[in-house]
UniProtKB/Swiss-Prot annotation:
Family, similarity comment: Belongs to the SurE nucleotidase family.
UniProt enzyme class: hydrolase
InterPro entries: SurE (IPR030048), SurE-like_Pase/nucleotidase (IPR002828), SurE-like_sf (IPR036523)
GO molecular function: 3'-nucleotidase activity; 5'-nucleotidase activity; exopolyphosphatase activity; metal ion binding; nucleotide binding
Gene3D superfamilies in alphabetical order: Survival protein SurE-like phosphatase/nucleotidase
Any one GO CC term of the record: cytoplasm
Key word Lipid metabolism present: no
Gene (name only): surE
Name of the molecule in the record: 5'-nucleotidase SurE
NCBIfam families xref list: PRK00346.1-3 (NF001489), PRK00346.1-4 (NF001490), surE (TIGR00087)
Localization per record: Cytoplasm
Cofactor(s) required, per the database record: a divalent metal cation
UniProt keywords, alphabetically: Cytoplasm, Hydrolase, Metal-binding, Nucleotide-binding
EC number(s) from the headed UniProt entry: 3.1.3.5
Length: 248
């Protein structure tokens, strides 16, 4: 299978390297990733600057842009044939609940979807871990199954894997997105020149994390697989808004 592999942690990230090693024997892999860490980039595109691509010693390609840029330039310009699958990851850290809105990992997969391709975003629920190899093995299982049972071209799967050795992962659960409380207060500081600066604080605590959610599956030791749609219409609210708008 022809696979385009990208991420948001950058071309030198451990999760990217481990996933490439796990898949390269059975698949034709092209790796195009940002030249730096782009965590939190969401779906941003570099519209105000040209993109440059450089091949690394590893054979991976580094782009001076965002995760979405990497997939866009790969599919729309660099590759001679469209990939059959876009995979983004393995991300260093979870992408659960509201995280997907900000996630460059999910954004790279979403860009694949915009290109008309099935796509998977993969995250390990730890920033540093000895379990990236285990996570990569789990991804290989999903890819092997996908070969035999293809996904629709407009399908995005958001996969989160618990920080456990391979043999301790209990299985896979199909989940819905949970939800977090609002983010914690930003951290105010002063730079060396006496100017006020702000750092983002911790993410919000889990709010909707009950059975059926991605949060709950991870807490129980399962891999969570959440189907995502790029249609952000709140369909259940359409009639309420129609009624509301008539009163203006």
């Amino acid at each position: 299978m022809r696979i385009l592999l990208s991420n948001d942690d950058g071309v030198f990230a451990q999760g990217l390297a481990e996933l490439y090693k796990e898949l390269k024997e059975d698949h034709e892999i092209t790796v195009i990733a940002p030249d730096r860490n782009c965590s939190g980039a969401s779906n941003a595109l570099s519209l105000q600057q040209p993109l440059r691509m450089e091949q690394m010693q590893s054979g991976f390609y580094a782009v001076n842009g965002t995760p979405s840029d990497c997939v866009h330039v790969g599919v729309n310009s660099f590759l001679q044939q469209d990939p059959e699958l876009v995979i983004s990851g393995i991300n260093h850290g979870a992408n659960l609940g509201d995280d997907v809105i900000y996630s460059g990992t999910v954004a790279a997969a979403t860009e694949g979807r915009y290109m008309g391709l099935p796509a998977i975003a993969v995250s390990l629920c730890a920033h540093t871990s000895d379990n990236f190899v285990s996570a990569a093995k789990f991804v290989r299982r999903i890819v092997t199954h996908l070969q035999a049972h293809p996904l629709p071209a407009d399908q995005i799967l958001n996969v989160n894997i618990p920080d456990l050795p391979y043999g301790e992962i209990k299985g896979i659960k199909v989940t819905r997105q949970g939800r977090r409380h609002r983010a914690k207060t930003m951290i105010k500081d002063t730079d060396p020149r006496g100017k006020t600066i702000f750092w983002y604080g911790p993410v919000g605590e889990e709010q909707d994390a009950g059975p059926g959610t991605d949060f709950h599956a991870i807490s129980e030791g399962f891999c969570s697989v959440t189907p995502l749609s790029v249609d952000m219409t709140a369909h259940q609210s359409l009639e309420d808004v129609r009624q509301w708008i008539t009163k203006i």
